[in-house]
Amino acid sequence: MYAVLVTGGKQYRVAQGETLRVEKLEVEAGNEIKFDTVLMLGDSDGIKLGDALKGASVTAKVVAHGRADKVRIIKFRRRKHHMKRQGHRQHYTEIEITGIAGGDKK
């Protein structure tokens, strides 16, 4: 069984036992988290699809928090002797999917 969930403004296709990195969540490492915004559920019988499936949820365990590799940004203006360098490291939360519960379409 798989599901498509929404967190941090992004959509992720997940299955039980998978590990993935999502935008930073304010949950301590080792705790469980429940995602209620599930857009799609699929299995061998078919799929359930909708804006949000009523009663559907995905539970996950927070494995760790971290920061991604640095992305370097350079803004350059030719012939003006101007160059601006900037770096950014995005915070993320690594989660492991522990369960997918089905539901009815809203």
From Swiss-Prot:
It comes from the Bacteria. GO terms for biological process: translation. Coiled coil: none annotated. GO terms for cellular component: cytoplasm; ribonucleoprotein complex; ribosome. Signal peptide: none annotated. Part of the 50S ribosomal subunit. Contacts protein L20. Belongs to the bacterial ribosomal protein bL21 family. This is Large ribosomal subunit protein bL21. It comes from Xanthomonas oryzae pv. oryzae (strain KACC10331 / KXO85). The gene is rplU.
